[in-house]
Amino acid sequence: MKYLVEATPGPLPPSPEQFDAATEWIEARLADGTFDCVYGYLEGGGIAVTNAADNAALLQRMTEYPLFGLVSWDVKPLLEFREGDELLRAKLAEAQAAMAG
């Protein structure tokens, strides 16, 4: 499964050593293919598209991040483009038919 993971810094800044550890951790995830991409925000924090077998595996990975307790998280599961289109279209047609009476 793919997830969009957003990390937003909390009120306490990390130490320079924590920052370095977090940067190295992210670089390792990019190198091994765990992360498809990572982008940062000008004001701090950022997003990653990551691959995980399931929610529990993603949570495990998040807790391994060196700044885990210093950021707040927003996680969204992702679908591949067009994944689920047939189901959505069928449900739209069903709803349209129901409204037509």
Q: Residue spans of the language-model regions?
A:
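Conserved, structured core segments of small domains
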Residues: 1-101
